[in-house]
Amino acid sequence: MESLEKVEDYIIRWLNDYADKSNMKGFVVGISGGIDSALTSTLCAMTGKALLCLEMPIKQVENQLIRSSKHIKWLEAKFRNVRSIRLNLDSVFDSFCSVLPESKYRDAHELSLANTRARLRMSSLYYFAALNKYLVVGTGNKVEDFGVGFYTKYGDGGVDLSPIADISKTQVFK
C-alpha cells in the first residue's frame, strides 16, 4: 500500500492540475463537520489555491455545527488561502416546504425532504463556484459514496471532482 504522504501529494498535485487545466481559481467545499469534509477541505487548502468553505445548516441546532466551525477556524488559522461563509438555508427550505402538497406517505416524504436538503446545498455550492470561478469539490469516499452509493443524486453527489473517491473510510481516519 502506498504511503499516506504519497497519496496526499498525489491528490494535491491532481487538484492543482485539474484546476489549472479547467482554468479555475480555486475550490468550494461544503463543510459538514464530518471526517470526509475535513480531509477534503484540508487537501484543497494544501494546494495553495483559494478555498471557500461553506457551512449550510438546514434545521440544525447550534451544537450540531460545532465540529464544522472548529474545523473551519483551524483551516483559516493554518492556511491563508481559506475563507468561509455560513449560509443558513432554513428560510429557503421552509419556503419550499410551504408549497408542497400534503403527502400520505410519511417515510417517503421524510426521505424526499432529506434529499432536498442535499440538493439545496449543491445549488448553493455551485452558486459560489460560478461567482468565483471555483470548482465544486465532493467529499465522498470510496466505500460510502462510490461503493455503497450512499449519497443523494444531484445533491452531495453533484460535484465537479471527488479527490477522496479512491480512499476507504479506514484510510480517511488515518
Q: Whereabouts are the PLM-identified features?
A:
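Metal-dependent de-N-acetylase/amidase catalytic core
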Residues: 168-174
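ATP-dependent adenylation/nucleotidyltransferase module used to activate substrates
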Residues: 1-152, 161, 165
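Residues forming the flavin
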Residues: 157
